[in-house]
Amino acid sequence: TLGLALLMGFLVMLLLETLGLPHAVHHDEDKDLLGLSATIGLIAHAAADGLAVGASVSSSTETGLIVFVAIMLHKGPAAFGLSSFLKHIDIEESKAKMYLILFALSSPLMAIITFFALKDTSFAIDDNIALTLLFSAGTFIYVATVDVLPELHSHEHDNDAPISFVLLGAFLVFLTTLLGHSH
């Protein structure tokens, strides 16, 4: 179940990109599209983080505080990474600031919405919160591996990483989840 939650976050991002999320093609003239694609991916990841915070706070104050601190500890590095990436691909400063503001707002807005939606329900239990965090991690892994890392490591901007390797990795996670493990 844990591996499936991680895999689902990854596959949802793959599906979003396949069905219309701006797809970066890693050419110099497509730097705006690449920046937008990475930003939208990180906004989706941050919204999933906000979902986890809102659900955990509606479940218990202690769990909510732990999840909030854990998520807040990586927001700074995530924002730094996004701003560094946008600078690396030469996105104009005003557009980069707008992307960072949208990224910064996505977690708190989703946390507030989730809190009020779940505060009197039975969904907000620790097991579901853990699954939500793993889903969020899957979205982040997608953005990092499919959009950001290929651009940072490519010297030739006309080569996309083959989708077959991405799908193979997703299948391996699924397979290991099916096989399980013993203690």
Protein language model features and the residues they cover:
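Intrinsically disordered, metal-sensing/regulatory segments
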Residues: 1-183
